[in-house]
Amino acid sequence: MVKKHSKKYLAAAEKIDHSKKYSLADAATLVKDISFTNFDSNVEVVFDLNVDTTKADQQLRGAIVLPNGSGNPKTVVVFADGEKAKDATQAGADFVGTDDLIQKVQSGWTDFDVAIATPDQMAKVGRVGRALGPKGLMPNPKEGTVTMDVTKAVSDAKGGQVTYRTDKNGNVAVPVGKVSFDSDKLAENIKSVSSTILGARPSTVKGTYVLSAHLASTMGPGVELDVSSL
């Protein structure tokens, strides 16, 4: 079934030259110009990668601290005790604890955006994996959320860290800011993300790695990027 788009979407799409690929600077400006929502939309960059996600070594996953932040305040939970709990609190974590937080999650509470845990707490956190996993909240070493350095982890999460991972089709979608951001700040964030994705190329990938890349705001049409400008 063909998806029907709104008049606003179609009007925005008409402003895009679909026969060309846009430079990073031009795409950042255009996405801001054609955004039509009545709220401060998120902006996302999507990479279509030539990877085989059935192979473990071609599954990308990690975290990036955007130089200009994401524009989305994060509620951060830290599973830690003792001195590490104190460090997390001082770093600005919203909720810090161990068994008490586990019990809250078991009762259905997942009203937070990022969960961080010290390695010694992961056995306990694993008990609520079914609640955290499907929501993308399970602490993970690749994303820097299973760590003894909770101060840095909380600081990164609060300071604009975003996570990424390939989906089953080899696509990676990463939020890079808001349409209210200056276009140069959006471009800086996108450049940071693209550098990370390009640097994470699996050694077993042959031929072209990035098949295409698009930039879009919430509910808006995608603007194809000139990969060479990244």
Swiss-Prot record:
It comes from the Bacteria. GO terms for cellular component: large ribosomal subunit. Keywords: Repressor, Ribonucleoprotein, Ribosomal protein, RNA-binding, rRNA-binding, Translation regulation, tRNA-binding. SUPFAM superfamilies: Ribosomal protein L1. Part of the 50S ribosomal subunit. Binds directly to 23S rRNA. The L1 stalk is quite mobile in the ribosome, and is involved in E site tRNA release. Protein L1 is also a translational repressor protein, it controls the translation of the L11 operon by binding to its mRNA. This is Large ribosomal subunit protein uL1. It comes from Oenococcus oeni (strain ATCC BAA-331 / PSU-1). The lineage of its organism: Bacteria, Bacillati, Bacillota, Bacilli, Lactobacillales. The gene is rplA.
